C-alpha cells in the first residue's frame, strides 16, 4: 500500500494551490537549491561523487531555467519576454560551461543572478498579494526586465 509522506503531500498541496506568480517563485527557489547542491559537489574528494553531484544538479537547474523560459508570455509583454529569454539562454550556456569544464565560476555567476531575480520576484509577489492582486501585471514584469537589461 502506497502512503505518501506528509511533507510530500504538503508540497503537492502547495504547488496545486499556488498562484502563477508563486509557481514562478518556486521555480527560482528550485534552481537556486540545485545550483547550491552542485557547488557542494566541488568539495567531494571521490571523482565519481564530484562529477555526479555537479552534473546531476546542474542539469536539474538547467531544466528549471528552461521551464522558466517556457513560462514567458510574449503576447503580454514581448520586450520583457525577449530580454528574459536572452538571459535564460545565457544562464543555460554558463551552466553548461561550468558543468563541462567542472569549474565553479560560471555556476556561481548564474547563482548570483538567480538570487537577484528570485528576490525581485519575491518582492513583486509580496506587493501584489498585499494589493489584493492574484497575479503579476506586465508592468511588474517590466521591472524585472529593466534589471535584466542592465546586468
Q: What is each model feature region?
A:
Residues 67-82:
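Short, solvent-exposed, charged loop/turn and helix-capping segments
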Residues 42-68:
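Alpha-helical segments in soluble extracytoplasmic regions
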Residues 52-55, 81-85, 107-112:
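Short, charged, amphipathic alpha-helical segments
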Residues 45-49, 98-105:
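Short helix-adjacent coil turns
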Residues 104-151:
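Preference for long, well-ordered alpha-helical segments
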Residues 1-11:
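Acidic, low-complexity proline/glycine-rich segments
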Residues 27-37, 57-67, 87-90, 94, ...:
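Amphipathic, well-ordered alpha-helical segments in soluble domains
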Amino acid at each position: 500500500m502506497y502512503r505518501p509522506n506528509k511533507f510530500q503531500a504538503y508540497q503537492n498541496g502547495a504547488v496545486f494551490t499556488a498562484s502563477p506568480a508563486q509557481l514562478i517563485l518556486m521555480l527560482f527557489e528550485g534552481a537556486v537549491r540545485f545550483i547550491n547542491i552542485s557547488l557542494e559537489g566541488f568539495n567531494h574528494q571521490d571523482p565519481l561523487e564530484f562529477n555526479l553531484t555537479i552534473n546531476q544538479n546542474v542539469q536539474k537547474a538547467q531544466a528549471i531555467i528552461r521551464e522558466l523560459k517556457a513560462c514567458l508570455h510574449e503576447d503580454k509583454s514581448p520586450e520583457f519576454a525577449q530580454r528574459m529569454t536572452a538571459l535564460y539562454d545565457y544562464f543555460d550556456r554558463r551552466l553548461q560551461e561550468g558543468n563541462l569544464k567542472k569549474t565553479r565560476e560560471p555556476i556561481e555567476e548564474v547563482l548570483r543572478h538567480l538570487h537577484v531575480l528570485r528576490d525581485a520576484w519575491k518582492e513583486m509577489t509580496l506587493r501584489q498579494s498585499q494589493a489584493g492582486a492574484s497575479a503579476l501585471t506586465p508592468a511588474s514584469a517590466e521591472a524585472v526586465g529593466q534589471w535584466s537589461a542592465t546586468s
